[in-house]
Amino acid sequence: MSKDVRQLLDKTYGGNPLSREEAKCLFASLVRGELDEVTIAALLMALKVRGETIDEISGAADAMREAANSFPRPALDGGILDIVGTGGDGFNTINISTTATFVAAAAGANVAKHGNRSVSSKSGSSDLLGQFGIELTMAPQTAANCLEALGICFLFAPHYHGGVKHAVPVRQKLATRTLFNVLGPLINPSHPDFMLLGVYSETLVRPIAEVLCALGVKRAMVVHGEGLDEVALHGTTQVCELRNGELVDYSLSPKDFGLEPVQVTELEGGSPEDNALITAAILKGEGKAAHRDAVALNAGCALYVAGLADTPQAGFKLAIDTLASGKAYEKLIGLAAMSQQDKA
């Protein structure tokens, strides 16, 4: 451990905020494996107890983005979109954001979905996609080929962020939320231009939008929907929208989209096998209305953020029409087939 890193740790332990560059230095040391487990635990808890600042979150994200395995981002008209949540909201819902990515892609967006295994549900994005035969550890060039040909790819977080492994045992033993809970959505190796990002707490909505602005994201909606890290079908969603470098706070309700609220229990998921059946039904234009509407709400807001709809409501209508066409399911089948090309 260098003298500079030791001084930064002491500064953190003293309750003093770090600059963005200082936070980057500390977390670069972490992902290089230079900090032992006790030090990592002390760092994460010192930040948690005081409360992480915008600069600290941004600096940690800078370090992890810089250390990531590179993704050969293709030159695409219209930019790249990600639909992602922090997880950790405590609800075991169906895979709303993951399912919404296929709808957005079928409606014309280029979606690079960055995900991992489950945090709060029984089935995270990679758990679900594996059920459809999608090769999670596809080579970066294969993922880029999928994005260019199909308008969608999946980037499995551990495949790109090997340095995070140094914090895994500590996070498991601490068994409490830390900075790493919000870092995942911020370190997509495709560096998306547009994001619909759900957070597990309303208090994170504006701060994370400020971080996205600092990281250079062009347009985004950061959302929290009455307990869920999604746009809510069961109640009011708090939104902070990033547009042209400015942040605007507002709320959305199901009635804004011509929908009646449902009970959150109607969105409960199950095992990866159960959720795969639900996702397939939704993408084929079948299944429960509540499932369809929850996915279309999130896909619609993402299409709005990506500039493919003038309003969230117009995005919702486009998503509903896309689901009815069955084209979203075709995207899923296409990704499953193309992701396997490394094995051919």
UniProtKB/Swiss-Prot annotation:
Chain sites annotated for binding 5-phospho-alpha-D-ribose 1-diphosphate: 85, 88-89, 93, 95-98, 113-121, 125
Catalytic activity of the protein: N-(5-phospho-beta-D-ribosyl)anthranilate + diphosphate = 5-phospho-alpha-D-ribose 1-diphosphate + anthranilate
Chain sites annotated for binding anthranilate 2: R171
GO molecular-function terms, A-Z: anthranilate phosphoribosyltransferase activity; magnesium ion binding
GO cellular component, one term: cytosol
Pfam families named in the record: Glycos_trans_3N, Glycos_transf_3
Family: Belongs to the anthranilate phosphoribosyltransferase family.
UniProt-listed PANTHER family: ANTHRANILATE PHOSPHORIBOSYLTRANSFERASE
Subunit structure and binding partners: Homodimer.
Annotated protein name in UniProt: Anthranilate phosphoribosyltransferase
Protein source organism: Shewanella amazonensis (strain ATCC BAA-1098 / SB2B)
Gene designation per UniProt: trpD
